[in-house]
Amino acid sequence: MPRVRVLLVSPDANARDLMRVSVGSIERRLGGPVSFLEAVDGEQGARIGLRERPDAVVADEIASRAGAFSLAKDLRGAADPYLGPIVILLERKHDAWLARWSGANAWFVRPVDPFELADRLVEMIESDRDQLRNQPKDQRETV
């Protein structure tokens, strides 16, 4: 199976490390290595996400200047939108409506259970790959 690339977005290096540990556990389940791209805010995350097209994006709600909600809106609203899974880690459960509004596929309230995060990411990445496999060859995006 091909390598999986995940973009981690947070101004906090410790938060990115925790995300990396949680997400890194999906390697065995997806049958291939996981590599990480990192951004410290939503603006940088949007640039990297649109340029690199990772398999998934995991963003901390407190992703400073342009936060996770803005990041998701920017990725979804771009001229060539990012269609992969976006997961937002929330500080408060009351912000779930913002995650939904922004176009996130999933959200978790801190503290995040790393197994739940990994399970959801695997589910979304496998679903995306199944859809791509079922798409006629002439309609597939070349990477």
Regions found by a protein language model. Give the residues of each.
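Alpha4 helix (beta4-alpha4-beta5 surface) of REC/receiver domains from two-component response regulators
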Residues: 70, 88-107
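Conserved phosphotransfer microenvironments
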Residues: 55-75
